[in-house]
Amino acid sequence: MPFFAYSTNYLINLQARIIVDVEATPANRTHEVESTRTMIDRVERRHDLKPRRLAGDTAYGSAAMLAWMIQEKEIAPHVPVWDKTARKDNTLSSSEFKWDELANEYRCPTGHALRSDRRKFRNPRSRVTKADTIIYRASQFDCEGCSMKDRCCPNTPFRKIARSIHEAARDETRRIAKTPEYNRSCRERKKVEMLFAHLKRILKLDRLRLRGPSGAHDEFLMAATAQNLRRMAKRLMLGSQQMNQAVA
C-alpha cells in the first residue's frame, strides 16, 4: 500500500522563538535540506532578513550545503560536518594525513606525499569526479616499502584520499564547532524541537486533512501562525503583568 508523507520545515528566530518561514516538503532528507535554501532566500527577498548563523543537525552538514552557507550567503554554519571518512577497521583515516595548501598535496604520517597529478593525461582535465571530489594518490613505490602499510592501505597497492572541492568550507565548519558560540547553538536547538513537539501533541497535527504539496503547505502555514500567535500572546501577557507590578 503506498504511503505519502510530508514534513514541515521551520526557519525560526532562536532568540524570540518566532517562526520566520515555513516550507512543506516530502519526508526525505534531500528535500528537507533543500527547503532551508528556499526559506533563507525567500526571507531575504521578502523581508531583507538574513541569519548570521544557522543551527541544525548533521543533515545540513554536507559539503555543498556548507559551501553555500559560507561562501554565497556568509552565514556561520553551526552544524556538525557530515563526515564519512572515519574508518572503523583500525586503519588510518584521512584526518591523520596533513594537508599542505601551498603544495596542493597530503602528507602521510611517514612524510610521503599524496598528489592529484600522478596520472598524466594528454589533454588537461579538471580531475574533479562526479561526486565533486579530487582524488589524491600516494606513490606505489613509497607504499610498498612503508612500515605503516598494514595500518594505512593493507588491501590496496597505494593509499588514495578523496578530497571534496568544498573542503575549505568543511574545515571552517570544524573550526566553528570548537567555539563557545557553537555550544550555545547546540543548546538552543531544543527550541526548534519543542515547536515540533507542540505541533504534534498540542495542535494534534499528526495527520493532514488537505491533499498534495499545496494542501500540506497551507496546513503547516496555518499551524505555524497559530504557534506564533500563542507565543506573542504569552509575551504580551508577561509584559503586561510586569508593568502592573511596577505600577503597584
What are the roles of these predicted feature ranges?
Residues 1-248:
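Anion-binding and metal-coordination hotspots
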